[in-house]
C-alpha cells in the first residue's frame, strides 16, 4: 500500500465570547476540522466559534494549542513529538506485534514498561495482542513463546503505512497489519488508525481504531488491548488500579480477577532521579556473577497515570477486563460480533496519559466525554 504524506491545513477559530484564537486542523481528504477547545465546558452549555483563514498577527496565531504534533518515521519505529519532546514511540518492526514504548507522562518518565523486564516479559508496553493462550485453537500472538506450553506463537506483521501525517492539533498514522499463525499462514487482515494529540501538557491522548477486514482463525478469536504499567508504580503496594465498576484490583477473592468496565486507570509514582552514568565498560552485564543490578527506586517522584477507555459502539461494551493479566497490567478483551464472526468489524479505544491519579485527572469525566462527545453544529 502506497504511503501518503498528507499535509494538514492550518485554520483558526475565533471564540465569540472571548475573541481568542484557537488553531484548528483541516484534513482535505476527509473534509473534517479538528480543534481542542480550551478550558472546560459544563454539560448543557455551548460555545460559538467563527472560522477564519488567517490570524491577525504572529503572536495571536499560536494562542491555543501550543503543542503541534510531529510524526517522524525511522526504519523500525515512529517517533511522536510535541513541544520538541518525543513523548511516544510506536515500534512497528522487530517484535511479534507493534507496541508503544516508551510512552512518557508529564513527569518525563514512561508510564508503561518496556520489553524483557521482570516477570511476564511478554507484557510489553501498550498495544494490541491476539489469541490469548490458544483456547479452542485460536492462534497465540500474546505469549511470545517459540515452544510449548504457550508456543509456538504467531505474529502481527507490518505491511505498510497508508498515511503518516503531522499537524497543529494532532498526528495520525494509518497502518496495514496482517496476522499470521505459528506456521506463517495469514489469519487476520487489519487496518489500524492511531491519532495522537495533547489537550495540555498534563493530558495526552491516543485514539485507536482497529478495523478488522477479515478473520479466518479458529476459536473465540480474542483481540486483547493491553497496557503493562511501569515498574516504578509498584502496583499494588504503592500505585493503584481503579475502574468504572469500582472493582478491587487485586480482587479480594483469589482467582476472581475478571470484571467489565468502561474505563480502567493505573497510576503511581514515576520513580526517583535517574541513575548516574555508567563508569564500567558496557561489556559488564548485569546478569554476570557478582554484577551489581541497578537499583530500581519505587514510591518516589511525581504521580502519573494512564487510563484506557472502551467505546459504547464496541460489541460487548463494556468489555471484559483482567483476562490473561496480573494486577500490574490492564487487558481489555474484544471479540468478533455474532453478526460478523469473520469480519468486517471495528472497535475503538482511547488512551489518556495524565498527571496525578484517576480522581485528580478527571478520568471518569474524560471517559464520559469519549462516550458522548459534544455535538457540533455548522452554520453558514
Sequence positions of predicted segments:
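Alpha-mannosidase-like glycoside hydrolase catalytic domains involved in N-glycan trimming
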Residues: 1-66, 90-169, 173-176
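Beta-strand-rich recognition/accessory modules
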Residues: 26-42, 304-380
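Short acidic, Pro/Gly- and aromatic-enriched capping/linker segments at domain boundaries
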Residues: 27-39, 60-79, 258-268, 328-337
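Short, hydrophobic/aromatic-enriched beta-strand segments in well-ordered soluble domains
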Residues: 45-57, 84, 175-177, 192, ...
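Acidic, contiguous internal or C-terminal segments within carbohydrate-active enzymes
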Residues: 69-74, 164-167, 173-221
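A short, structured loop/turn motif at beta-sheet edges
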Residues: 85, 163-170, 199-202, 270, ...
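Acidic (Asp/Glu-rich), glycine- and aromatic
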Residues: 90-105, 199-240
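Active-site/ligand-binding surface loops and adjacent short beta/alpha elements
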Residues: 217-314
